Amino acid sequence: SKLPELEQFMLHKIYNLNLNFEKNFEIYNFHTLYKELLNFCTVDLSAFYFDIRKDTLYCDKLGSSKRKSTIVFLNILIEILLKLFAPILSFTTEEIYSLLKINTNKSIHLENFPKIPTHWNNKDLKNKWNELIKIREICNSSIEFKRAAKEIGSSLEANLIINLNEKMIKLVEGVDFSELCITSDAKIEKS
């Protein structure tokens, strides 16, 4: 089944991460390889994807399609990340691999590097989500300003009104900004 756009965007990120991994691995550029993996985990996953989807895992019904899609993505993610981190964190990845029993191989080090499907490379989706991330960053700055002024406690107390031009409104059609920005409500208005 088709994954939601956020998961598709993250698969696009994995596609590019893997391309860079292969390039750096071939030329023994392990420092850059590790830096890119770390950046992906801290910025793309922790500060972005997990921040948005954690409530889906904890709060949505067990059978909800969004929760199922999140779990499908997380399963894809762990298998790929284990293979990418294996040359760098050999003992840690070996232990995780043995606990998860992903495949019948006795060791993560007997696995091939991931073969990422080319359809994960989606430049249109990347462009759209790069714009959404910019909007999210502006919204988060506004929320932090209100938080610093002690007008709100958490982002969930915020009700956003996002002013966009007509072109941007069409681009972001169907996006739930309250979920993207982790607020109680978000409305789009034409500027």
What are these regions (language model features)?
Residues 1-22, 50-142, 155-164:
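Acidic, turn-prone loop/beta-hairpin segments
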Residues 25-32:
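Short helix-adjacent coil turns
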Residues 34, 38-39:
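Aromatic-lined ligand-binding clefts that engage carbohydrates, nucleic acids, or primary amines
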Residues 42:
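Conserved oxyanion/phosphate-binding beta-strand-loop segments in alpha/beta enzyme cores
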Residues 144-151:
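Active-site phosphate-binding and catalytic loops of NTP-dependent enzymes
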